From Swiss-Prot:
Homotrimer. Residues 242-427 are annotated as: N-acetyltransferase. GO terms for biological process: cell morphogenesis; cell wall organization; lipid A biosynthetic process; peptidoglycan biosynthetic process; regulation of cell shape; UDP-N-acetylglucosamine biosynthetic process. The lineage of its organism: Bacteria, Pseudomonadati, Campylobacterota, Epsilonproteobacteria, Nautiliales. It catalyses: alpha-D-glucosamine 1-phosphate + acetyl-CoA = N-acetyl-alpha-D-glucosamine 1-phosphate + CoA + H(+); N-acetyl-alpha-D-glucosamine 1-phosphate + UTP + H(+) = UDP-N-acetyl-alpha-D-glucosamine + diphosphate. One of its GO terms (cellular component) is cytoplasm. NCBIfam families: glmU (TIGR01173), PRK14359.1 (NF010939). It is found in: Cytoplasm. Pathway: Nucleotide-sugar biosynthesis; UDP-N-acetyl-alpha-D-glucosamine biosynthesis; N-acetyl-alpha-D-glucosamine 1-phosphate from alpha-D-glucosamine 6-phosphate (route II): step 2/2; Nucleotide-sugar biosynthesis; UDP-N-acetyl-alpha-D-glucosamine biosynthesis; UDP-N-acetyl-alpha-D-glucosamine from N-acetyl-alpha-D-glucosamine 1-phosphate: step 1/1; Bacterial outer membrane biogenesis; LPS lipid A biosynthesis. Mg(2+) binds at residues 99, 218. GO terms for molecular function: glucosamine-1-phosphate N-acetyltransferase activity; magnesium ion binding; UDP-N-acetylglucosamine diphosphorylase activity. Residues 1-220 are annotated as: Pyrophosphorylase. It comes from Nautilia profundicola (strain ATCC BAA-1463 / DSM 18972 / AmH). InterPro entries: Bifunctional_GlmU (IPR005882), GlmU-like (IPR050065), GlmU_C_LbH (IPR038009), Hexapep (IPR001451), Hexapep_transf_CS (IPR018357), MobA-like_NTP_Trfase (IPR025877), Nucleotide-diphossugar_trans (IPR029044), Trimer_LpxA-like_sf (IPR011004). This is Bifunctional protein GlmU.
């Protein structure tokens, strides 16, 4: 059986972040989670080597069926040191890095198909400056040369080490104990095994991999580029499954959102952790942790977490938060928070549910076929029963019974010729 070991113990100092490198997110999901999910497509036998922010990373991956190993950096530093603490269980062992969130299972599968003592990934770069070169003869790796040690011919080699390896079990069991930390950094290097194996005449096959999938994330700039690629993959998947997207390069969809039926997404939309079913989300709208079914949203609307909208129209500049809306219309300029509103109800422009008193939040419940006039304030907690009309400009702070009209306005007072008196002008 294949065993996969994911090396994720490093600090990632080049990220310049208080967050562990592998916990940085692309489209809402951490790098380490992407790698685990792709690995699980190949084998259930997965080990993750951790150290930096051990508790936080462990908490992130606790729901995955993986074995967690804590690397002792004092006794066994380095990539080779990480392997010294992992029991070798598989007939073949695939070594991955925790900062490669774009890897794909189908590409990793190709490593198993090669018959060699070691399979080593290489990337062909247009500009390999700054990288060590991999010398390959007839598909076999002969040596890895650091750029500073390379001769003129070796500097012309476009192949560099991509950092992913497949070892036969016997190779690791034989050569891991031979690893030495007799170097300037006092670390155990995994690449030293490559040198020992080559000297002993064993086979090291090179496999060329896609730079986009295997290039590691080492900085915030790398992270932004990787997220751009991941978001593109997510959008392509949903478009291939029938979702219409207008100017998709302007749309952000995270890894946890899903679409069912015929859906349409306008330009500039942001959709996070949401389920969109047979609905249209129009331009420049934001939907977060919500369920939208048979509804039209936007343009320029915001649907916040814990909201469920069914058969509903939400227009421009309407914000919905933690509300269940069934068959209603809120065309423009409203805030509906902590609300339950039933079918046939019309929400006039400027309607506000006043759900917070400075200490706690309260619910607004509105029944069926309610007409709420413009510029209405609903002071929660409040219940409005079916078939109610609320006049424009009203402030509602009491429950309203079925079939009633509610109106709260100061009487209109008209003072004749006031304008002329105020400004001292004649009529």
């Amino acid at each position: 059986m294949l065993q996969i070991i994911i090396l994720a113990a490093g600090k990632g100092t080049r990220m310049k972040s208080s967050t562990a490198k592998v916990l940085h997110k692309l489209c809402g999901k951490s790098m380490i989670e992407y790698i685990i999910e792709e690995s699980l497509k190949l084998t259930p036998n997965i080990d993750i080597v951790l150290n930096h922010q051990f508790e936080k990373v462990s908490e992130t991956v606790k729901n995955y069926p993986v074995n967690i190993v804590k690397q002792d950096l004092e006794k066994f530093p380095g990539t080779g040191g990480a392997l010294k603490e992992v029991p070798i269980k598989g007939d073949k062992v695939l070594i991955l890095n925790g900062d490669m969130p774009l890897i794909k299972a189908e590409e990793l599968k190709k490593f198993e198909e090669l018959d060699a003592d070691i399979v080593m990934s290489v990337m062909k770069l247009d500009n390999p400056d700054g990288y060590g070169r991999v010398v390959i003869e007839n598909g076999n790796v002969k040596k890895i040369v650091e750029q500073k040690d390379a001769n003129e011919e070796e500097l012309k080699i476009p192949y560099v080490n991509a950092g992913v390896y497949l070892f036969k079990k016997d190779v690791l069991n034989k050569y891991l104990p031979k690893l030495s930390n007799n170097n300037s950094q006092k670390e155990y290097y995994l690449t030293d095994i490559i040198e020992m194996v080559e000297k002993d005449g064993l086979t090291i096959k090179a496999i060329e991999v896609d730079e986009e999938n295997f290039k590691g994330v080492n900085s915030k700039k790398d992270l932004a580029h990787a997220e751009e690629i991941m978001c593109e993959r997510i959008k392509n998947f949903w478009m291939q499954n029938g979702v219409i997207m207008h100017l998709p390069e302007t749309i952000y969809i995270d890894a946890y959102s899903s679409f069912e039926g015929e859906c349409e997404i306008g330009n500039g939309c942001v959709i996070k952790k949401s389920v969109i079913i047979e609905s249209e989300v129009r331009a420049l709208s934001v939907v977060e942790e919500a369920v939208i079914k048979n509804s039209g949203i936007g343009p320029m609307a915001r649907i916040r977490p814990k909201s469920e909208l069914v058969n509903t129209h939400i227009g421009n500049f309407v914000e919905v938060k933690a509300s269940r809306l069934n068959g209603i219309k809120a065309g423009h300029l409203s805030y509906l928070g902590d609300s339950e509103i039933d079918e046939g109800t019309n929400i006039g422009a400027g309607t506000i549910t006043c759900n917070y008193d400075g200490k706690a939040k309260y619910k607004t419940k509105i029944g069926k076929n309610v007409f709420i006039g413009s510029d209405t304030q609903l002071i929660a907690p409040v219940t409005i029963e079916d078939d109610v009309m609320i006049a424009a400009g009203s402030t509602v702070n009491k429950d309203i019974k079925k079939g009633s009209l509610a109106i709260s306005r100061a009487p209109l007072k008209i003072i004749k010729n006031f304008y002329y008196k105020f400004f001292g002008r004649e009529n």
